[in-house]
Amino acid sequence: SNDSPTTRRHQFPSPSHPSESPHAPAPLTMTQEEAPAPVNFWGEHPATESEYYAAHGAEGESSYFTTPDDAGARRLFTRSWRPAGGGAGARPRALVFMVHGYGNDISWTFQATAVFLARSGFACFAADLPGHGRSHGLQAFVPDLEVAVADLLAFFRSVRRREEHAGLPCFLFGESMGGAICLLIHLRTSPEEWAGAVLVAPMCRISDRIRPRWPVPEILTLVSRFAPTLPIVPTADLIEKSVKVPAKRLIAARNPMRYNGRPRLGTVMELLRATDELGARLGEITIPFLVVHGSADEVTDPAVSRALHEAAASEDKTIKMYDGMLHSMLFGEPEENIERVRGDILAWLSERCTPTSTS
């Protein structure tokens, strides 16, 4: 079974009764809010991850990767997903290296897209970012995105160096802040490393609509020097703003690894710095890319994705805008919307893969 101890270890109590003893008698009737939180985002059945993967035509496993870093090795929690039943000789169509967004992680709803791609013939790999999920660092504290870029690159390259992956095309895939990280990876590596990038509602520049007004940035800059970990930056409820289907908001909120506090000062300052850099360097982007964005997204600005598509030097670049969709395009929308976006991503990736030798 692919259920590693890291996956099985977390049996989470209900969020509404955090201090209750596991042996306390259960109340006779429970509302939906009081029911024990599911251990998996899809609910009670199937009971294990490996059964869920198998039911969706995929296989998966989780482990820890330790970065080969001179300044002290760091541990990242990682996952991989492959097409089911791939024997020793079976090769995936390509490798997809996936990066999640701010406050999120790779073990909850983010997995659904990876499982979909694995079922479609791709081998997918992802890691919890520093300060997220089960990886190193204070929760939701990202004082230096360069550390995240270096950690992910070390993991992605270790996967790519495996003998069975020789010669396979390698794609980057990023959601929201993960989209920004994918572009930073591209700007810091040679173009021939990547066959392309899929950017889902990427955070390429903080929208003027939500960027703090003067004198707030100046005050934040000053305070963040002394107290970078303070979780005090005012922000809207991200789940409310991102997820359209109300029942899915409850699922997102029940992610036991999710950070629900206010953004930390140092994280916000670093995101402003990194997105300012990206905004200024859009013309240097040469990687083939697909950018998908919902027209009603209030978390990352669809106008910035249009600017990216306009300004990028890439010869192969595609933008798809989805009328009325919000920020969480691959989970928070009605199923038919998710299918549309998935289908467009799959078609784009498939066109850029070398056909299998059997075709």
Say what each PLM segment does.
Residues 21, 27-70, 75-84, 234-240:
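An N-terminal hydrophobic leader/cap segment in hydrolases
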Residues 102-114:
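The serine-hydrolase catalytic nucleophile loop
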Residues 105-108, 133-168, 336-340:
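Catalytic nucleophile-loop/oxyanion-hole region of alpha/beta-hydrolase
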Residues 116-136:
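Conserved alpha/beta-hydrolase
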Residues 175-264:
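Alpha/beta-hydrolase-fold enzymes
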Residues 285, 291-293, 297:
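Short beta-strand/loop motif that positions the catalytic acidic residue
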Residues 287, 301-310:
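Short alpha-helix in the alpha/beta-hydrolase fold that links the catalytic acid
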Residues 323-359:
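Catalytic active-site module of serine/aspartate enzymes centered on a nucleophile-bearing elbow/loop
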